[in-house]
């Protein structure tokens, strides 16, 4: 994993335009490494058949990373056995969404980040830019590969919180805001679960072994006390693990 920028709340995520509440003239964050340095790293990996995962949060960093992935694809073709991934990618340029699909780049998000800083996106980025943050439903409509995670220890390592926030766009503790933040980007439970399981396995390049229950796969699974696909989303966090299996072997039972 490579880091290409910081975070919006500290004005270290790299933007194409300055922050709405600039701390100094031209405040638009910065890349953590020069773009040419990242380009050399990604191209060297692509030449050897390897893929790269890059931390990008601001639209400037996302756009620059996609430019590099695009050049790598032109030179060496799209990766065949693993998948380039952008991690977090919170604030995108609208035109870069379709580039994710074109380049088969995984959009790896942490749903609990949505409400980590209430009011922060509007404060730092303004209403227009904040309307295209964590666009899970749009990704699904456009055919973008998605992966979900917790980003522990930044947020708790609690799987049901991930699913709850992806489905409701509400904070897992306060349940704010009513109706969800950007409710048009809510997704159904089946999509959220798929992103969290098979999507994450795909991002890791191990979807042939992990992420779903199919003949020949590892049979890593949990048994829950209620069905996350049918339970009321507001009751989802009460779900308890009854058993855990690793490679088909029982390793935990309540």
Task: Give names to the regions the model predicted.
Residues 1-46, 51, 97:
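Active-site-adjacent helix-turn-beta-strand microarchitecture at beta-sheet edges
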Residues 6-9, 25-29, 58, 126, ...:
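Glycine-centered flexibility motif
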Residues 43-53, 60-84, 89, 94-98, ...:
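His/Asp/Glu-enriched, well-ordered alpha-helical/loop segment
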């Amino acid at each position: 994993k490579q880091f290409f920028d910081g975070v919006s709340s500290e004005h270290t995520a790299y933007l194409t335009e300055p922050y709405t509440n600039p701390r100094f003239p031209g405040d638009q964050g910065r890349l953590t490494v020069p773009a040419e340095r990242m380009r050399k790293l990604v191209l060297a990996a692509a030449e050897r058949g390897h893929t790269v995962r890059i931390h990008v949060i601001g639209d400037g960093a996302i756009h620059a990373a996609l430019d590099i992935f695009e050049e790598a694809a032109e030179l060496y073709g799209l990766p065949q056995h693993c998948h380039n991934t952008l991690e977090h990618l919170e604030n995108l340029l609208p035109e870069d969404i379709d580039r994710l699909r074109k380049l088969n780049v995984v959009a790896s998000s942490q749903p609990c980040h949505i409400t980590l800083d209430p009011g922060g996106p509007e404060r730092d980025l303004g209403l227009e830019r904040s309307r295209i943050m964590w666009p899970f439903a749009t990704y699904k409509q456009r055919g973008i590969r998605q992966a979900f995670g917790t980003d522990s220890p930044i947020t708790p390592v609690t799987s049901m919180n991930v699913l709850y926030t992806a489905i409701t766009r509400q904070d897992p503790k306060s349940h704010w805001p009513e109706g969800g933040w950007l409710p048009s980007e809510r997704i159904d439970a089946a999509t959220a679960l798929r992103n969290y399981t098979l999507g994450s396995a795909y991002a890791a390049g191990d979807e042939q072994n992990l992420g779903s229950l199919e003949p020949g796969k590892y049979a890593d699974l949990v048994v829950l006390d209620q069905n996350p696909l049918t339970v009321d989303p507001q009751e989802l966090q009460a779900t308890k693990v009854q058993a855990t299996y690793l490679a088909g072997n029982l390793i935990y039972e309540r």
